Regions:
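Acidic, mature catalytic/reactive cores of soluble proteins
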Residues: 1-57, 69, 78, 84-877
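Transition-metal
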Residues: 64-65
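Short, surface-exposed loop and linker segments with low hydrophobicity and enrichment for Pro/Ser/Thr
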Residues: 73-75
Length: 877
């Protein structure tokens, strides 16, 4: 791969600390309102404490938000785009969506916007927002969705008909960096309608408010320089120094303060009229007498009152720079943009060199979404609990949400699952994000993964915080798996893996592994139980709220995740031990632990049943009641298939370098044979690779037949999360109450976990990626000695590598055009997405309909759904 592109050089300059190319980026959140961080209510009602209607008038404490925005890495100075079509009741400063309680399937953004391009250094970025020319249907979206139930489709913006006559603007926002602190901005507004339409554009610059909460030696200021006809403002900020913002000549220039309108929000008194929502008042009421009075403030916007003819595009240029520039918007401006666009294309081509044109477009937008959703995230639990000077948060907080995480304190750039729907980190999501990040920026991927092991994130007992709604929830421990993936990707592309990174991850994850063992294996039988494991509603009851009847649920997925964790730690230790033989002892530790887990899952002990059902050929959760009675929960879900993912092929070359470990393997096998114990290593020869698998080959074969059965798990677009066999519902009675589950290929029909995700049939990209990686690992050992009919009963036998390839193609097909030019992801709105100005736009949803591939859940989850970019790279490798 050509690593001599300008973008590669920028990354090298940044990570070698020669230049700071990442000081500025798309770090501005898309939604700060309705978050846990901004919630100071006594009952933890985050959605209603600071709702969308307050956001324009109320100062945030822990961050900022806006549309197509940027900030410096600590969110001191922010820039974003605001719009008004002359008809809306509010100035469009931020994206609108429904709260969790408002939506019939939980929270949901109700806007059309797309991440088109982004480079890892953010040297070039492009964003598209589609803004209706008629009044935005705020009330209609809320009212109609509240009428709908869990069994109904969500009412989306396209369903309102507001785009039917193409009466909308395409608003393209582009950024190009001349240098790390010299950002060029271009806002292009195109009228897609058939008649002239007016629009007011407010490129808005503002300063995050610290002075109202923490106090500052000197309040920052934005002020107009050079008199009333000048076209630039200066920023003076004690934390980041001085900047200038240059801009095309506006219709007018407005200033106000980024401070709460106490009168509007709290029925209080304002000491002056310059409040956060002043631009809204001025624009909507067409009264600029106050907003134009001052030539300084902490929030500023040049206003461009445009009239745009049909098909016409008007462009606004701005430049935010650390240094004074002569002719800032002149020919050099266009030259920089032209260079950065070409460099972005060149970088993309090196990363996707073997992809087809269509595949490259999918990858480009997947990378763009991943990079656009890097966000500044600030949350200091102890400060949040006790409040700022002059404030008195309710005492209930000290016993409420996250109150036992007082050591958590961060202000970092983190990868968000979705910058509007999930504008907070989720530990296991982030691990998957990093695997795709590693395709474009190895260093960011490694640093991001390491962050979660830092002492200001990880608790002293080794627990990794889950997500802000409840840091104490438990998510699948996939950090070690991701670390190995990233290490191997870098090794494959550069010829050398980062052993220091691997060691650092290993040492901290050893603490986390111990926490898992101590917390989740209460019976000390190596079968793991209890808690929420990230697959929200996959069980017959909410697993995070305890077990009905006071029993214990021995979870096959919990046990499988721990077995996978064991093997990931073993693989890391093996790699490190090749350079540092002191790690051989850790190899033995994790191998031994894996042996006991494998034995426990397949056969716990004499007189005790395993999780495996011989008659049905599946692993099931087991419910143990207080009276000792136990029975399986016979749900055929990916929980029962996860046992396949715990597999490791240890190369004979590795074993030759580690003689103590090799002899221990032989001893273990001999000892267990002599004592009639469960054989973990089925096939063993001193001169061959060694396969460690949680499930024996016979059971693995049976499970594979279920996976590849199109009447069960194999859908046209990937592996389903629940067997289609459950079209006939499964029901069970526990302690006098009835519980059930059925195949639901689309949205959730339950309120479990807010009801905005569904693991009862849809296709999830991260789990599919994990299975495909698993198939490759098995193939590395068996090669052509193990084949399966694909699909089952097809009569066509493929090896496991080929099967992974074919399933990858099904997943990629979700986003690709079919012979009619339709993308399955757009199943409901196909007609609109064949339109000239929609057809190349791709959304990367949270999960996908198990029958037709339709996108579901969060619409911009290019967090883990960006893994499709990895799949494309892998099938072309």
């Amino acid at each position: 791969m050509n690593k001599d592109t300008k973008e590669h050089k920028r990354l090298e300059e940044h990570y070698s600390k020669k230049k700071d190319w990442l000081k500025w980026g798309p770090y501005l959140s898309e939604r700060q309102w309705g978050t846990v961080r901004e919630d100071y209510s006594p009952n933890g009602d985050a959605w209603n404490y600071l709702p969308h209607d307050h956001a324009r008038s109320r100062t945030y404490r822990w961050g900022e938000d806006g549309m197509a925005g940027i900030s410096d890495r600590y969110c001191n100075i922010c820039f974003a785009v605001a719009l008004w079509n002359g008809k809306d009741p509010i100035l469009k400063e931020r994206l609108f969506g429904l709260t969790g309680p408002q939506g019939n399937h939980g929270e949901d953004v109700k806007e059309l916007y797309y991440y088109l391009e982004n480079t890892p250094s953010h040297s070039y970025m492009k964003h598209l927002y589609k803004y209706p020319q008629n009044e935005f249907p705020y009330d209609e979206l809320v009212a109609e969705n509240q009428k709908r139930g869990k069994h109904d489709l969500e009412y989306q913006l396209l369903d309102t008909g507001i785009f039917d006559n193409d009466e909308y603007f395409d608003v393209f926002t582009e950024y190009a960096k001349a240098e790390g602190e010299d950002l060029l901005v271009k806002i292009s507004i195109c009228n897609r309608g058939r008649k002239m339409a007016p629009v007011s554009v407010l490129p808005t610059l503002w300063i995050r408010n610290f002075w109202s909460f923490l106090g500052m030696n000197k309040k920052p200021i934005i002020k107009r320089e050079g008199g009333k006809q000048s076209q630039y403002v200066s920023i003076d900020h004690e934390y980041v120094g001085k900047y200038n913002l240059y801009f095309d000549k506006p219709s007018r220039l407005l200033f106000t303060e980024n401070e709460t309108n106490m009168e509007r929000v709290f029925n209080g008194t304002n000491e002056h009229p310059f409040k956060k929502d002043l631009f809204h008042d001025a624009i909507i009421e067409n009264d600029f007498s106050v907003a134009e009075k001052n030539m300084h403030g902490t929030k500023c916007a040049p206003v461009y009152e445009l009239e745009i003819e049909p098909g016409e595009t008007k462009t606004i240029k701005l430049r935010l720079t650390k240094n004074a520039v002569n002719s800032p918007l002149g020919t050099s401006f266009d030259s920089v943009f032209s260079k950065r666009i070409k460099e972005s294309q060149s970088f993309l081509e090196t990363v996707t060199e073997k992809s087809s044109e269509e595949q490259r477009e999918i990858q480009k937008q997947a990378f763009a979404g991943l990079l656009w959703t890097k966000q500044y995230y600030n949350y200091e639990i102890e400060q949040w609990l006790k409040g700022d000077p002059g404030t008195s948060p309710p005492q209930e907080r000290w016993q409420g949400r996250n109150s036992n995480w007082k050591t958590f304190r961060n202000h970092d750039i983190l990868s968000m699952p979705d910058a509007w729907e999930y504008p907070w980190f989720a530990a296991w999501d982030s691990a998957f994000h990093c695997v795709t990040f590693s395709m474009v920026d190895h260093e960011f991927a490694k640093k991001q993964l390491l962050l979660f092991t830092k002492e200001w994130y990880m608790a002293a007992n080794g627990q990794i915080p889950a997500y802000e709604w409840n840091f104490s929830d438990v998510n699948p421990p996939v950090q070690a798996w991701a670390a190995i993936q990233i290490y191997q990707m870098e090794q494959r592309k550069t010829g050398k893996g980062d052993l220091s990174f691997l060691k650092r991850m290993f040492n901290k994850l050893a603490l986390n592994f111990t926490w898992w063992v101590n917390r989740e294996d209460s019976s000390n039988n190596n079968v793991f139980e209890g808690g929420f494991l990230g697959l929200d509603n996959i069980g017959v009851f909410d697993r995070s709220n305890g077990v009905p009847g006071g029993g214990v649920l021995e979870q096959v997925d919990g046990t499988s995740w721990m077995a996978l964790y064991c093997l990931n730690m073993l693989e890391m230790a093996l790699e490190i031990a090749k350079e540092d033989d002191s790690f051989e002892d850790m190899c033995l530790k994790y191998f031994g632990h894996f042996v006991f887990i494998a034995e426990a899952l397949n056969k716990i002990s004499e007189g005790s049943s395993s999780s495996w059902d011989e008659q049905e050929g599946f692993f099931y959760d087991k419910l143990i009641l207080p009276n000792g009675e136990s029975f399986p929960i016979k749900v055929r879900s990916i929980s029962g298939l996860l046992s396949l993912t715990a597999v490791l092929n240890i190369r004979k070359e590795t074993l030759e370098k580690l003689p103590r470990f090799k002899s221990s393997l032989a001893w273990y096998r001999k000892y267990r044979m002599e004592n009639m114990k469960y054989q973990v290593i089925e096939e063993y020869a001193p001169d061959k690779d060694v396969l460690l698998s949680l499930v024996p080959r016979e059971r693995m074969t049976i499970l594979m037949q279920s996976i590849l059965n199109e009447s069960e798990f194999l859908g046209d677009y990937g592996i389903r999360s629940l067997s289609k066999a459950h079209e006939k519902p499964y029901n069970i009675q526990i302690d006098g109450d009835n519980y059930g589950i059925k195949y639901e290929p689309a949205e959730s029909t339950t309120d479990m976990f807010g009801g905005n995700s569904n693991w009862r049939g849809p296709i999830w990209m991260p789990m599919n990626y994990l299975f495909i990686s698993t198939f490759k690992e098995y193939h590395n050992y068996f090669e052509d000695d193990l084949k399966f009919a694909y699909p089952s009963e097809s009569g066509t036998d493929l090896n496991l590598k080929e099967i992974g390839f074919e399933i990858s193609k099904r997943l990629i097909a979700i986003f690709a055009k079919d012979t009619n030019g339709n993308r399955p992801v757009n199943a409901i709105h196909q007609e609109k997405y064949t339109d000239e100005h929609f057809k190349e736009l791709i959304l990367f949803y949270e999960y996908f309909d198990g029958n037709n591939g339709r996108g579901l859940g969060a619409a911009h989850q290019t967090g883990w759904t960006a893994l499709v970019a990895n799949l494309i790279e892998e099938i072309n490798r």
